[in-house]
Structure formats: structure tokens, C-alpha cells
């Protein structure tokens, strides 16, 4: 939660109208003693006496000392008017955002027919937000009433809750925010702008979960796991490198600002590292959208998408670890080895705990959908799936973990296991539901970014810091991509080309996650400067890099129009035959374990556990195996169309055309006499809507006359060497 800002003071007195927002009022009889208000005073640090008419931010409490009845009636009338006015203003504010989303959708529809070469719809959504924010800030003014503002309260601290004594009655006010000294006469305007500024927790609890979940739920796992090692390197090592490079450069800028007298508040090295973690969260949603439309090379798409998905999770955990850095002693901003290792331990603990919680929630959902008959009631099934998925984020946050990591891995688990248990209608519903929520949330955030540039009231723009930040993010991205790509190419058969590296460098846009991390805490001078600079970075990268994506693809000669399923057809035969060797033994073991044990345990798919578990586990196997598994034993159903391709020597059929990858009869004896492990491996290869299952079952697919029948695999499989 954002820590409360201190109330601004002027000449030793507290200007209460700068820091207090009326949320509720409590009236007590005049005869009550101060001692009886002790518990209430524990949440309030001061009690102030006011004249008979007092107001904060448009709240007017008319107090008539002549009679209690008249005074009560006046208060009720004023309260009703205020409630009605507040309701109308809140409705108008929500209407603004609805109209922004509507305008964005119409613009996207227009772009479907006439594409703007150097402008993407996300950038245009930000422009719409900027225009609306400009109008709200400078075009609309609320008439001010000087009688509704009282400046006579004096306190010596900045309490979260304030009890105010007004003619013997006590009213409760809560801290809302700081108002700068030059805005004292615009209290009503400030309140209007504050109402269109959402609580930062809205982003984390409402808008981010569907975005992150959909990233995991729609993950193309075949290409993701092919490049998993590279993706993990970019996401973990790359983000850490970027964070420390940016933090070090920004610390130099801050030191320069101190020397030149440009720094008006405290800014420590830990703040610089926190800023590095915030802006290290890449969000190339604009670039990926263009990649998807142009069907860019699937390897590049997988690297960028996988990095951005895990990078967000790493960045938020890294920022939490930096905030938790607490060296021993009085100075909490010095370097301490013990505290550093403690922060590393916190990072590992939070990440692993969040991962476990997300996976566990997915497993629970698997069992609920497997052993109940919810599939007969599609509405209930979809509702349960939605609530269980969303609750993962809140559960992780409530337990002190990171909801972003938890909901990401929950989405991956739900897609791989729970999806197979859902009815066909619920499968379509869940995909469409989260796709819609992701679309609305992303566009809302980009529109809100533009709005915030004018409605946020505590911006701190420093030219030195801004210029240093832009230099730092470019150098940090370069230190992430190029050295790691060089090291990864040493162990990759399919090299990451220089054009791919340049494109990945170019595609390091900042977006929703960086904005959400920056706006979550703007209590201090340093945090306010971070937020303002992050906002400018997001604008620049989305407009310039997002708009220049098409031109950069052409300049770097990167393939477009590539079918992700048939991309392997252009690969030479010798490279295709080495695909099996490229697959890491760890993932081959995982696939075997997943197919034979996890999928039968969690879903209706896969072989029954009674055939894979030892005989001594028979009762448990029969209990955990669903009846559908026995029905599907001869024709295993796997809706996951994105598994790793391990073999390139099997004839596959796409629609009405057959692809000849290798002679099955010539290669089968050689392949199946290798090791007993490979003999027992059950291969499930899926391309598009056509599934090929090899498990000793005779399969007949449309073949050309020149091709050997696919069922010859069954014969050669059991033929002697």
C-alpha cells in the first residue's frame, strides 16, 4: 500500500485542506469526554477546534448553535446534496473512461481497414488520454467557495486519521494527499482531478490479473519450450543485469544533480536500483501485436513473448526485494553484504512461493473440474474457472507473495491441464472471456497513462534525470541482449542472428507493468520523480519504437508471413533429423513424466494410472483415474497443440496435402532400436487441428500415392533389428 504523504506545513501550521479527505463523519453528544474517545484518538493524532462552519474539499457542515433540531436538518440537507453531487461526478468520471475505450475500439476497427504505418492503436489510445487529461486540467474549473475552506488547524504530525472538534461535535477526516503551496486556492479543481486518478491498487488487483493470466493461458508452449533456456536467461539474468546497469547510471546522474543543486529531496542508491527494476519491466505489446499480424518468424516471436512474460514477473519480485533491503545500523541506505544476501533470499523465496501457489491453485481447479460434473453446467464451470484463476492473484498478495508470478503460472497450469477437463463450450468461453478482459484492461491502462500526465498532481520532472534515464534504459537493454545472445549462441544449434538481436534490442518497450510499479508508491520526492520519468519513457518507447516496428523489420530483413505450424518445412533434412538431439534430456524426461503420470492424475487425458503406476498402487490408481480416461485409452485426446517437436522423420498431413519429412520405413528400425526409454516414449504431435498419436495404435491418414502408409510405423516398430 502507498504510504501516506505528510501534510504540508506553512509557518509551523498545518494546512489541513491540503491533506484531508472527508470519508465519513461521526457525531457525538457534547457531553462526551475526551477520555472516552481514547480508542478513536489512537487512529488520529490530533483534535482541532473550528468555527461553527467548516469544510474540507467541498464538504460543508453547517452547524447552527441556536438549536439542535435545525442544525441536524441543515446537516442532512447538505449531506444529501453532497452525496448526489458526488454520485454525479463519479458517474461522469467513469463515463469518460468508457468513452475513451469506445473511441479506442472504433480506432482499432478503422486501423483494420487502413493501417497507419507509423502509429499503432495503443499509441493512439495514449494520445486520446492526453487530450482528455489536457481538457480536465486546463479546460474545466470548479467554482471555489472560500467559505468552505478553513485554515486554522495546527498539528505537529501527519496522522492518517484526524478527529475534528466542531462546536462540541467530532468529525473524522482521513489523509488523502499533499497539495503544493501554489495550488491552495484550487482545492475544488484538485479534488476533481483526484477523482479521475485511480487508487494504484486498482491496477494491481483489477487490471493486471487478466493481462498476466491471459499471457500464460494463451502461451504457445511448443515454441516457448523450444527456447526455454534462452528465455530464462533473458528474463532472469538479463533483467538483473539491466536493473544494475540502469541503477548505476542513475546513481551517477543523481550524484551530478546533488553537486549542481538540482535535487530537492533525498535520493539514495537503493532508490536508483528500484528505478532500474521498474523500467527493466518490458512490455512489447505493440510490437507483438504487429508481429502477430505480419506473422513474423516464430523463433523471434517466441523469444520476445517469452522474455516479456517472465520479465514482468522477475521485475516485480526484484523491486520487492530491493524495497526489503534493510542493512543493520542506523543508516538504511549503506551497502551491507548480509542485507544483500538477505534480499537475494527474499527474491528466491517470493518467486518460488508465488510459483508454487499459482501451480497449486491450478491443480486444485484441475481436480474440481475432473471429479465433479460441472461440465454439464457450462455457466457454472466457466464461473468457477474464472473465480479460481482470479483468486490466485489475491491469495498470493494476501500471503505476502507476488500475485503477478502466481497468476502467470496458474494460467500456464490451467491451459495445460484444466483446459482438457472443461466442456467444449467452456473451453471457448474461457478463452474468449480472458481475451476480452485482456483487451479492455490493456487499452484502459494505455488511455489512463495519457490522462495521468495531466491529472497526477505531484509530478517531478528533472531534465538531467530524464535524459540520464533514457540513456540508461538503452545501455541496460544492450547489456541484456548482446552479451547474453553471444553466450547463448555457444550452445544453440539454431543461432540467434544479429538481426534478431537488433530487433530484440529495438523491441524493449515499456508499458503497463512499468507504469503500475511506478504509480504504486508516489509518497516521496524520489518516487514522484521515478513515476514522472517512467511515464515519459513509456510514451517515447510506445510511440517511437512501436511505430517504427514495421520499418525496422524491413530494414533488418526479418521474415514475415511465416506459418507457425509449417515453419519447419523450410528446414533442411539434416537439421530436422537433429531436432531430437537438440531437445534437452531434462525436458524429454519431463514430457514422459507429464504424459504418463501428471496428465492422467489431473485430467481425463493420457493413459489410465492403472497402466502406468506399479501394481502396488492399484487402489490409489483406480481412485484417481477418471472413467473418461478408460474410454479414451485407445484414442488419447490432447488439446495442447503446442508441445515440443522431438522427431522430424514422421509423415504429417496438413489439410489435404501431405508433407514428406522422411521415409518412415527406412528410418523406423534405426530409430526404435536405440534405447528402451525412447521405445517407451509416447509421442503426441499436434499441428493445427490435426492430431497424430503414436501408441501402438493403427492410424490411417490421407496420404499421397507416392508415400508409404503411415501405419507401417506399427510394423517397423516391432520388427527385429
Curated annotation (Swiss-Prot):
The chain crosses the membrane at residues 91-111, 123-143, 196-216, 231-251, 272-292, 298-318, 344-364, 388-412, 434-454, 456-476, 499-519, 535-555. It is found in: Endosome membrane; Recycling endosome membrane; Early endosome membrane; Late endosome membrane. InterPro entries: Cation/H_exchanger_CPA1, Cation/H_exchanger_TM, NaH_exchanger, NHE-6/7/9. Endosomal Na(+), K(+)/H(+) antiporter. Mediates the electroneutral exchange of endosomal luminal H(+) for a cytosolic Na(+) or K(+). By facilitating proton efflux, SLC9A6 counteracts the acidity generated by vacuolar (V)-ATPase, thereby limiting luminal acidification. Responsible for alkalizing and maintaining the endosomal pH, and consequently in, e.g., endosome maturation and trafficking of recycling endosomal cargo. Plays a critical role during neurodevelopment by regulating synaptic development and plasticity. Residues 1-44 are annotated as: Disordered. Residues 26-37 have a biased composition (Basic and acidic residues). NCBIfam families: b_cpa1 (TIGR00840). Disruption phenotype: Mutant mice generated by CRISPR-Cas9-mediated gene editing display an early neurodegeneration of the cerebellum and a more protracted timewise degeneration of structures within the cerebrum. In both the cerebellum and cerebrum, lysosome deficiency is an early pathogenic event, preceding autophagic dysfunction. In aged rat SLC9A6-null brain show deposition of amyloid-beta and tau. It is a multi-pass membrane protein. Ubiquitinated (in vitro). It comes from Rattus norvegicus (Rat). It catalyses: Na(+)(in) + H(+)(out) = Na(+)(out) + H(+)(in); K(+)(in) + H(+)(out) = K(+)(out) + H(+)(in). Its main location: membrane. This is Sodium/hydrogen exchanger 6. Pfam families: Na_H_Exchanger. One of its GO terms (cellular component) is glutamatergic synapse. Gene3D superfamilies: 6.10.140.1330. Belongs to the monovalent cation:proton antiporter 1 (CPA1) transporter (TC 2.A.36) family. Homodimer. Interacts with RACK1; regulates the distribution of SLC9A6 between endosomes and the plasma membrane.
